[in-house]
Regions:
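Structural detector of well-ordered beta-strand residues that form the stable sheet scaffold
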Residues: 78-80, 110, 260, 282-283
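Short active-site segment of divalent metal-dependent hydrolases/proteases
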Residues: 59-60, 115
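C-terminal active-site subregion of NodB/CE4 polysaccharide deacetylases
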Residues: 1-54, 60-62, 121-123, 135-324
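Charged helix-capping and loop-helix junction motifs
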Residues: 17-20, 91-96
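Histidine-centered catalytic micro-motifs
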Residues: 2-6, 109-116
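A short alpha/beta connector and helix-capping loop motif
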Residues: 63-83
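Generic enzyme active-site microenvironment
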Residues: 54-55, 110
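Acidic (Asp/Glu)-rich catalytic clusters
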Residues: 29-30, 67-74, 94-111, 275-276, ...
Length: 324
């Protein structure tokens, strides 16, 4: 099972290009491909020379770039959607594009939680945002920093593009449906700006700044962070899954029962709770290959984004299929 995210027109670090993606699809064009929604009726048993193609998040270029290539080679695929961004962010798909892809018979749409937001795992930073940080990281972190804005700023700053990220702390994070985690307390951003803009702090090296802040956050954790309760966590998990599921099922008149964990961060509670929300299968990002008899509890994926070199991709595919 292959995993992709974006497909860019040109070569970009960390993101597969249109030409690179087409080479991947050309290589697998003679294999049997399936959509996730087809697996249950097959009892999760696939042909020996078969492959699953997946995309996470639901970016616009899945339609503008990848879809035409899938059609060219008649390859089936599944896109795991973050529905909060659909119709609300220019970098993501809209429902008309999603319907067109689904009605083509080639593309299925499944669950990736409603928002894909992270939570702070530990009151410790690992670095700072640079001026040229990409939109993907900023978009993910915006939900964290927005919690720390003042009431006035929350009314004014509604989008990650409105926030200056330069110099903000990069925390250790996890998916908000994986662990309880922590939120920033309201007003954190004002306090943070106050001491990082002081002459004493500015004169420190990046390493010294990190050490200073980690000591400060450890000593005054309750002043800056708020632990998420078990009740809040479970409510969040339920909302993220059920709202994601509701929107896809209502808009496409289909069942959505496969959950791709954001970042591959698995739920640390009793997974039966998530199953009761209508989830039958869980999709990972482990880098492993699946057996012909797929385990619906753990559908593994190989990260196609990271195999940009065609010779390496070919070698990987030969290893996987010769091994089986």
């Amino acid at each position: 099972c292959l995993m992709y995210h974006n497909v860019f027109p040109e070569k970009t670090e960390g993101i597969i290009s249109e030409k690179e993606f087409e080479k991947h699809m050309e290589y697998i064009k003679d294999m049997k491909t399936y959509k996730m929604e087809e697996l249950e009726k097959m009892n999760y048993i696939l042909d020996e020379k078969s492959i699953l193609v997946t995309f996470d998040d639901g970016y616009k270029n899945n339609y503008t770039k990848a879809f035409s290539i899938l059609k060219k080679y008649n390859i089936k695929a599944t896109i795991f959607l973050n529905t909060v961004y659909i119709e609300n962010d220019k970098d993501y798909l809209n429902w008309n594009e999603i319907r067109e892809m689904y009605e083509s018979g080639l593309v299925d749409f499944q669950l990736h939680t409603h928002s894909h937001y992270p939570t702070i795992r530990k009151a410790e930073i690992k670095g700072f945002f640079e001026k040229m940080e990409g939109d993907f990281v900023k978009r993910e972190y915006f939900s964290i920093f927005r919690e720390g804005l003042s009431k006035k700023e929350k009314d004014e700053i509604k989008d990650f593009r409105d926030l200056d990220f330069t110099g903000l702390p990069v925390f250790k994070i996890r998916s908000q449906i994986s662990i309880k985690g922590m939120n920033l307390k309201e007003g954190f951003m004002d306090k943070y700006r106050e001491f990082v803009n002081s002459g004493e702090f500015i004169s420190k090296s990046s390493k010294e700044k990190k050490i200073f802040l980690n000591k400060l956050f450890k000593m005054q954790k309750k002043e800056f962070f708020e632990e998420i309760s078990e009740e809040e966590f479970e409510k969040k998990v339920e909302f993220e899954v059920t709202e994601n599921k509701r929107l896809i099922e209502e808009k496409l008149n289909k069942k959505a029962e496969f959950l791709s964990y954001p970042w591959g961060h698995t739920y640390k509670g009793n997974v039966e709770r998530i199953k009761k929300l209508g989830i039958k299968s869980f999709v990972m990002t482990s880098g492993k290959a699946n057996n012909v008899k797929i385990n619906p509890e753990k559908i593994y994926r190989i990260n196609g984004d990271k195999i940009k070199d065609y010779n390496l991709f070919e070698k990987k595919m030969k290893y996987v299929y010769n091994k089986e």
